């Protein structure tokens, strides 16, 4: 093999390696860039959900419904962004990051289901069907408690791996 061939092979390997490094950096970088927006949407969704519950307890059904819809929109927005990040996972994506993203997706799916049940309960209470409204409210509460378990797992992952979460 000539020196010229060796140089060509070296350059090709260098280009492939550089491309892989850039791709991995961009995947992790895009995840780090998206996380503040995702976190803000989750916090806003939690706040809207809690406001919806307070408004429901005050029998302000229309306002409760509006807040619940806002919560659901915030949770869905975060979920869509996380699914996009998950679709771009590679075999080199850190297992802690994978676990974190999957945990937050599960948390959000439960929060979305809880919000859907809360919306159903609002409709039943508004129509004076309190027993059925109570059933949906209880289910919403159960789902939100399950979501909080995932939220605690997520928070522990961040606390245990501060170097991975900037």
Language-model segments: which ranges?
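Short, solvent-exposed, charged loop/turn and helix-capping segments
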Residues: 74-106, 160-166
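C-terminal amphipathic alpha-helix
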Residues: 31-77, 113-166
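Extended, hydrophobic/aromatic-rich amphipathic alpha-helical segments that build helical scaffolds
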Residues: 104-116
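Hydrophobic membrane-insertion alpha-helices, especially the h-region
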Residues: 6-22
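Short, charge-rich amphipathic alpha-helices with coiled-coil/heptad character
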Residues: 17, 46-53, 82-91
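Transmembrane signal-anchor/signal-peptide helices with a preference for the extracytoplasmic
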Residues: 17-37
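Short, Lys/Arg-rich N-terminal segment immediately upstream of the first membrane anchor
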Residues: 1-4
């Amino acid at each position: 093999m000539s020196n010229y061939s060796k140089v060509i092979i070296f350059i090709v390997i260098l280009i492939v390696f550089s491309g892989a490094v850039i791709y991995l950096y961009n995947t992790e970088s895009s995840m780090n860039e998206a996380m503040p927006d995702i976190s803000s949407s989750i916090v806003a969704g939690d706040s809207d959900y809690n406001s919806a519950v307070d408004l429901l307890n005050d029998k302000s059904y229309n306002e409760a419904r509006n807040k619940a819809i806002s919560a659901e929109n915030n949770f869905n927005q975060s979920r869509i962004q996380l699914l996009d990040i998950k679709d771009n996972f590679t075999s080199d994506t850190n297992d802690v990051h994978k676990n974190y993203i999957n945990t937050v997706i599960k948390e959000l799916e439960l929060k979305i289901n809880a919000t859907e049940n809360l919306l159903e309960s609002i409709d039943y209470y508004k129509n004076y069907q309190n027993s059925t409204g109570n059933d949906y409210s209880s289910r919403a509460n159960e789902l939100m408690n399950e979501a909080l378990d995932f939220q605690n797992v997520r928070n522990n992952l961040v606390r245990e791996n501060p170097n991975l979460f900037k």
